[in-house]
């Protein structure tokens, strides 16, 4: 360790700490002043909380500590109340205004430290304000931004920024849970609850207003009452003359006077009328300032009118006839000057547009970019940042948490979704009637199903009315579609045939000419097309029923510019549409799927023609805007909208009297009818970087035949029927469930806020889906993107020992005994066995091993590199900067793997087995042997047949008993003789007991003595007094009772005593030990600890004997000698009590160390059990006089107790062997003996064992997460793959892909702005 390094850190920190904090506090006040409008309501609540704290000082230290903790955490508005109802984000700044303090902090960061929390300035703003700040003031710098890091320590700063957002979410979850629990416990009214109710009421009102105007089908929004042209945006220039006269204060004007430009007034009146239907979004606050200025002018002029009218006396001076005209002309000129100073424009939308109630609104963001006057909050925030000299995007990244915000919130997905929805609604996406000629188009005609209000549950947060974004509104439809049933009936095959593949996004590349394609094919660089063609060939010969896509469906960022001309759904239609075949079709139909030179050239000619037509239409349309009348353009726009969904709803939109469940055509078919086989899909982590909602949206748009992705997690149930013609129509039936999960969400991947809050809803759904499938299905398969384990390069990123994700998945997999788990992510093909789990990894549809490499994972280069794996995994890490030495060790669980071929897996599922083969995409031939796994339905029997499952377990248990008894006959004989001897002695003891209560308690002990299972069920109804007496008798005659029974009774008695203490404490303030203490003067119990052994030994010494000799002499004493001894002891204590103490002393000396320890543990039970019954009167509590007890019977009992066990003498070896038995072996010994000795007791044990098995197999799943309790299930750290992605972002001096995504988002927003500009009304 370098001591000088720590010295450099510590000494300056001490010297500069006070001035640094002082400077920070001063500037923090300045920054708050700059954004005082934002904090106005916050400061008011803080002052109210201070008053409340002064009034509640008497409530206790615990409450004061809790509220002070909440107060110290930050602003009450954003931390104390439930954050999920607020629309604000936490924007943190880590930079001091003082130059010396800043240099000192930079030195600490360079030495490896992080920016301290005392340097943090927190501002709570809306997310759209952050984006406006970025795209308005830092966009030019962002587009030229080449790298982020000036030092390797800044890389740690980048990681820390994201981790802070993750931890903030964890802390919010925890604190809100504590806050709810305290409120529920205290049952106190809280102002925050009123605030929450107010916010929810407002959101409910907005949502109800939305439902009155709009309906959703999961893909688009449809207006009920208005046509599309009603919602066309209005373009308002900032410098446009827009003055409207004040008619109320206008003086009477002589009609002879020349009026003010009538046409201008009419136009402005029309604009005023339209302004009633349109509204400016939140960020256009310049209009408010304009109104204030105009209002002030009107007020002053009104006063002038009144003064002039009071002085005038109905004069008709010609100079004053046009006075009002001159005045209004002057005001109009002044208004022009104000307008001329404002450059830019804004777009106004109707206040009932489907995005008007969204906090993050892309139209508002466009207005912030195009308008000269920006949001006041953004302007003041930027002013504060400039004072801190944060003027470049590099500074913004290094000294704020803006990257953490991008990782935490779904900015990309929401804005891309809004852009697409707006473009599709207004028909701004050009389409051809025949988009792709190669792919057979879907012939089925189905209805559009639209949805109304969605009923939110406690676990759901990203649905209305809590959330009003476009994503949340669409998700309210998606959440209703999570379970689907399909039926397959065959007569030529007894199996369901399906294929799986993963990581298809890496294969989406720019198309080339036919000759170039042939050249790439020669070197193997046509991976995805090869996989697609091989799958279609397999489908043609085996008639596949469906395909499973395992995630990572989007291309690299450098391909996005090219792919935006095609749209994602068109490429999916080309490559992954598999025509549905009938069983009667011939198997040689594979030729219909082959791609020839002619149809490839024809396809690209169509694409090129389409792109050219699009560019031409855009130019013509842009040129026609200024010359074409608005009405004609609007009609033309509607006529050119060729969207399938919009055409289907055209009749519905125009005629508002019809129901909104409108069919596309009068003749319809069932929704379940497909011309293409289903193509089921899920998300990978790369999909969350770009636009994940588009993939779900395309399911409802139905533009990709067979494409199936209704929600980010869902379940598919297949009912299969095989009609065997050879066996006269005998049917073979089975049911298979495929559960598709979002593994990235379970890992709390980015966007962190969305996935963290939706974690528990998916967790509970998985538990429910698995439970239902275990009851109903013969097969259960789980489908997810990330592997449980693998031997690939990323294996240590997802090691099952590290992540909470794998703990959760492992618990589900083992508990429900699933039949298989399909995954991808690692670019290889592999089959693994992890205990009883069957794991399939298939992520090599387009790359091998190195997914990001341009050469090493592609073509025959990848085949060569992968063939010598894992040697290359180590060697190439020193050559290629993108590689990491991860997963280089071969997994010991791998049964088969292929790391050098691209391909997919083919499966045939029958009633009893699943047969799997991995197929090489280039050759179309299997590269693995047939992998056969058997059905595990019998292991899931406890879920669908609990009684049958229990009976099977009992049969297995009885077989073990039989095996044990057959192997140990002498052991069984010994135990039976011990039972007989003990029962004989116990019967004698019971007959000599004093009272009926003791006899009843002793009978109960004899009944429970040889019970091994379910003892608690037999003593649940026993009273406390009887339990206490049973415990006393069991300890007194402990040599004849089962040790477990004595221990169990002692524990139950302790629990009963604790309950009694709680009850008495609540009623009266008694001492907690009062129930155990008795009056020593009333009675001295035998075995009382106050009777010390030393006193007994002194007494024996006075007699001149040793303890052993004393017992022998006592047996030989006459009655007179015993009476004399009793007189010497005194009448208060019986002689038998002293004798028992002596015997106990001798017995302890003979015990081993372990036996002595066990004996001492039961001393406390003896003390508790010997407590006299206080409910009886004092005269009944004392024992009967000694002279009234039959002395002969007492002597017999003592003889029985002290007599050595004859059976133990005869079987010494077996006694020692019994002590070494395990718990299970001892139970087998007891039951084997009871089966012969006492069949009734044996049957009772078997029945109790059944109940134990049922309780252990109770089919209620693992556990359910309570409200706001997710932090108990998730990891405290980011998942390793998030860290890997962030580490890849943190390379010094390189262009980072993440910032290309931000630039691409800005370009998309500007593209939408240009498209809106074509249809906007001036």
From Swiss-Prot:
Reactions mediated catalytically: O-phospho-L-seryl-[protein] + H2O = L-seryl-[protein] + phosphate
Annotated region described as Disordered, given as residue ranges: 267-326, 613-646, 1066-1087, 1170-1196
Listed transmembrane segments: none
Ranges of compositional bias, category Basic and acidic residues: 267-279, 288-326
UniProt biased composition (Low complexity): 631-646
Keyword Signal: yes
Alphabetized SUPFAM superfamilies for the sequence: Metallo-dependent phosphatases
Mutant phenotype after disruption: Conditional knockout during the mosquito midgut stage causes no defect in the parasite development with normal production of sporozoites. In sporozoites, phosphorylation of eIF2alpha is enhanced. No defect in host hepatocyte infection, however, sporozoite development in the liver is impaired causing a reduction in the number of exo-erythrocytic forms (EEFs) produced.
Molecular function GO labels: metal ion binding; protein serine/threonine phosphatase activity
Coiled coil: none
E.C. designation(s): 3.1.3.16
Signal peptide limits: 1-22
Region of interest: Interaction with phosphorylated eIF2alpha: 1-535
Taxonomy, superkingdom: Eukaryota
UniProt keywords, alphabetically: Hydrolase, Manganese, Metal-binding, Signal
Needed cofactors: Mn(2+)
GO biological process: peptidyl-serine dephosphorylation
Cofactor annotation comment: Has weak activity in the presence of Mg(2+).
Function, in words: Protein phosphatase which dephosphorylates 'Ser-59' of translation factor eIF2alpha during the liver stage, thus enabling protein translation.
Protein name: Serine/threonine-protein phosphatase UIS2
Organism annotation: Plasmodium berghei (strain Anka)
Lineage start: Eukaryota, Sar, Alveolata, Apicomplexa, Aconoidasida
